[in-house]
């Protein structure tokens, strides 16, 4: 008899939910949750499907995740079609197997088992699901959180099912994430002929000392939970394509992944002061993708660590490394936020896969977390 977690994961993987498409995944989840007494509230925005579901009342534990997946790449490089889930050598293959339809299946089955064992559970169990995490992330969790905050919805704990693990399920738990802010800098000069530089003003030449200082700056030293803030230049653009024209404008895009030692406003101030010292003529636009968040300790971290230890006999590392996740939006509700999911070695790659046994373990861990917090 096939494991219910694997069976549900396969149903979800069959749906080609390329972001922000949901392709019917949420309807499968909604039917399962409604069958065990959850109230379902669709919260759709633009081209994005979201839902908020809950059962019970009081102290609230939510499970969060996304049904959308990234593009498959060249399908001829896959050993089996990416939307035809296949099990080989104990591994479940398919786009979204690890990121994160396997986690979604583990969550749903954990909820079914939990409700069967604790039909009158004392707290509230909730689900926050979106189809817009992998692409723009503009009409997904961020909009749901805004709506929930506007009506003062309670959220105490949130478990995000992102693939956090490295070598074996549960070895890494993300108890926070760095913030992310991107600068779009345009340095203005005067276009001209390269043979007559005195009649032009080359913005690339003017910018180099400032960019050198930008790269050499140590923005902070990090702290016990976060590595030092990282600044990386991502894109440069100047010139007309001709070898005899001095460019009139120089575009530089750079990104900060910042710790709780900094704020976005402090980064903006320091960058502006640096550019002004170099007397540049510039315009600067900022895009804040997310603030850093940290769940240093508390009931949720304890419950997650206990659940992992119970089923694997390993003590997970608590880390804040990696990119951003929807946890950055959920943390704004004041909730404790932790990420626990399968091994991330193949996410976004050709032949994405996850251990079938790991998904079964993960579902048991999720159930154990529910039992510790809201049973």
Swiss-Prot record:
GO terms for biological process: diaminopimelate biosynthetic process; L-arginine biosynthetic process; lysine biosynthetic process via diaminopimelate. The keyword Lyase does not apply. Pathway: Amino-acid biosynthesis; L-lysine biosynthesis via DAP pathway; LL-2,6-diaminopimelate from (S)-tetrahydrodipicolinate (succinylase route): step 3/3. One of its GO terms (molecular function) is zinc ion binding. Its cofactor is Zn(2+); Co(2+). The keyword Isomerase does not apply. HAMAP family: DapE. Catalyzes the hydrolysis of N-succinyl-L,L-diaminopimelic acid (SDAP), forming succinate and LL-2,6-diaminopimelate (DAP), an intermediate involved in the bacterial biosynthesis of lysine and meso-diaminopimelic acid, an essential component of bacterial cell walls. This is Succinyl-diaminopimelate desuccinylase. It comes from Yersinia pestis (strain Pestoides F). The gene is dapE.
